[in-house]
Amino acid sequence: MSLLFCHRSPVVEVKAMDQLPSGSRIEIHATAFDPWSELDRWGGDAAACAQFVGRVRGTGMDGLPLQALELEHYPGLCEQRITAIALQLQRDHQAGRVLVLHRVGRLAPGEPIVLVAVEADRRGAAQRCCAALLEELKHKAPFWKREWCGDRGTWLSGNTAL
């Protein structure tokens, strides 16, 4: 049984996590993480590994300079939704282990917000699964974003397009 840590509830049990390949990780972080160190720590010996690191943009949706991005999530449900998405895509693309780290809280422009990595026997499977996992994560995981420009915070109604 895998245990996940998130910023509000100290430990969340996600049963579907047991169905992902051993070594897969899905975590919500309230503090900064170094994506390159996390990738090194995750490591593996698969023939292919595709990864994506997303950072907070420097401008808001209205084009103004962004001071911060605030992210909220639904603890427990968020991890379950991401795990279900990862499991389905891992099967669809015949991929191996997956790594999904996502930040919550208040982030400054340039800070890493998400890391998605996928291993597979072939680069095509790893790349397709990684891209699909990122898109599903952006549109189906219960995260809420609030942009801070100056002293004004604005909740976003949707995610940016590809």
Where do the PLM segments sit?
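N-terminal, polar/charged subdomain of small-to-medium soluble alpha/beta proteins
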Residues: 12-113, 119-162
